[in-house]
From Swiss-Prot:
It catalyses: (S)-dihydroorotate + a quinone = orotate + a quinol. SUPFAM superfamilies: FMN-linked oxidoreductases. Gene3D superfamilies: Aldolase class I (3.20.20.70). This is Dihydroorotate dehydrogenase (quinone). The gene is pyrD. Binds 1 FMN per subunit. Substrate binds at residues 66, 111-115, 172, 177, 246-247. The keyword Membrane applies.
């Protein structure tokens, strides 16, 4: 497969520049006959989850296609689902560059992107143009300059605008790169947010005559007690699914490596065990009451199977996809 050569060239570039260059090429082919260049035939392995039928259990995690610019090209590679975003009500530039770093030896990434995106209206226009036949998740967050106390309003604005176009909606309250965001995972703040989101979901269901499930994305850095509280809140509010996990602030597995001290969330292989352990504990706590989408360091069939054995119904990749390329999709879907 050609990807090792492509990767070698891309890894000569700054990580964000490599991402921009790749997306420039994907934008050129998305929705055109040239999509055949990236198309892969993968077996159908349907999974029912959150009331939806996924054509296979492997999805693309949020963060790669923030604005939904390359949905069709990414879909052609064989993903059973694609989660676009995180998107916010208003466009925002994100944090200062550089803000994305490779830990090549660990096959990890550190990012402090800060929800850079072109805003929800732009994303909706891109979704309208897409022809992807898998499940499209849309991941939403709050603008950096929205006070945390008013954060729920940003989620409700996004929900209203994307509801008609989303297969499911992911609520991102676990990015470490938006000040105060992770506080929404706890206690009263979480209950308040989930109440508002569930009420909005009910209103939108009545308006659009369709039910769009809601999944909440959580951090891997929760204590045992916090995890129990989160699980309890999700069940009490009838949330449809949980995505576990986002990136970690823990650096214990990458000490001494180049870029290890950069601020931001660590993803990729160093997150693998930590996220699997959260999934296992969450699964025990939830006891089948809502499904788990497992994400964090999946870079092989074995890693994907470990997430499913720990209790995940579906899995997603991001960093592994950067390091291994499209062949990883085919390998996981074929052998999982």
């Amino acid at each position: 497969m050609y990807y090792p050569f492509v990767r070698k060239a891309l890894f000569q570039l700054d990580p964000e520049r490599a991402h921009e260059f790749t997306f420039q090429q994907l934008r050129r082919i998305t929705g055109t006959p040239f999509e055949a260049l990236v198309r892969q035939k993968v077996p159908a392995k349907p999974v029912n989850c959150m009331g939806l039928t996924f054509k296979n259990p492997l999805g693309l995690a949020a963060g790669l296609d923030k604005d939904g610019e390359c949905i069709d090209a990414l879909g052609a590679m064989g993903f059973g689902s694609i989660e676009i975003g995180t998107v916010t009500p208003r466009p925002q530039p994100g944090n200062d560059k550089p803000r994305l770093f490779r830990l090549v030896d660990a096959e990890g990434l550190i990012n402090r992107m800060g929800f850079n995106n072109l805003g929800v209206d732009n994303l909706v226009e891109n979704v309208k143009k897409a022809h992807y036949d898998g499940v499209l998740g849309i991941n939403i967050g709050k603008n950096k300059d929205t006070p945390v106390e008013q954060g729920k309003d940003d989620y409700l604005i996004c929900m209203e605008k994307i509801y008609a176009y989303a297969g499911y909606i992911a609520i991102n309250i676990s990015s470490p790169n938006t000040p105060g965001l992770r506080t929404l995972q706890y206690g009263e703040a979480l209950d308040d947010l989930l109440t508002a989101i569930k009420n909005k979901q009910n209103d939108l269901q009545a308006m659009h005559h369709k039910y769009v499930p809601i999944a909440v994305k959580i951090a891997p850095d929760l204590s045992e007690e916090e995890l129990i509280q989160v699980a309890d809140s999700l069940v009490r509010h009838n949330i449809d699914g949980v995505i576990a996990t986002n990136t970690t602030l823990d650096r214990s597995l990458v000490q001494g490596m180049k870029n290890c001290d950069q601020t931001g969330g660590l993803s990729g292989r160093p997150l693998q065990l930590k996220s699997t352990e959260i999934i296992r504990r969450l699964s025990q706590e939830l006891n089948g009451r809502l499904p788990i989408i497992g994400v964090g360091g999946i870079d092989s069939v074995i890693a994907a199977r470990e997430k499913i054995a720990a209790g995940a119904s579906l899995v997603q990749i991001y960093s592994g996809f950067i390091f291994k390329g499209p062949p990883l999709i085919k390998e996981i879907v074929t052998h999982i």
